[in-house]
């Protein structure tokens, strides 16, 4: 029975798991959106929300506590300056998980984890490329429907019937 057991092991050692989540939290705050597997995203949400809550306090002690998880000074400054101000009025729920399908190599369920009040200018180029591909497919579809095939008459069946 799993009484009072919190969190996922994700088939990693404790050191690997904590280092991975520290790196993922730093990447999430740097890019404001990352793509990862769904179990990692669900676990990362816990870390990220706690760090943002610490940043909202704005005290030197809160900065030291956040520095345990966010090891990059630039990202830490961004967290305490811009992100803390952005989420000042929000009582919680700073991140959103959106499922995007399955990964081609191992069929793992993938998700996008992003900050809720994300700036629209911070959109990655991958989305723009995806939109261009979708538009290209839509343009090709009418060309295929342009020339319908002529119906073939069953000549052999008519010849056998006579």
Curated annotation (Swiss-Prot):
InterPro entries for this protein: Ribosomal_bL17, Ribosomal_bL17_CS, Ribosomal_bL17_sf
Keyword Ribosomal protein in record: yes
Keyword annotations: Ribonucleoprotein, Ribosomal protein
UniProt-listed SUPFAM superfamilies: Prokaryotic ribosomal protein L17
One Gene Ontology biological process: translation
Residue stretches of biased makeup (Basic and acidic residues): 126-162
Xref: Pfam families: Ribosomal_L17
GO cellular component terms, A-Z: cytosolic large ribosomal subunit
MF term (GO), any: structural constituent of ribosome
HAMAP family from the UniProt entry: Ribosomal_bL17 (MF_01368)
NCBIfam families assigned: L17
Assembly notes: Part of the 50S ribosomal subunit. Contacts protein L32.
Family: Belongs to the bacterial ribosomal protein bL17 family.
Stated name of the protein: Large ribosomal subunit protein bL17
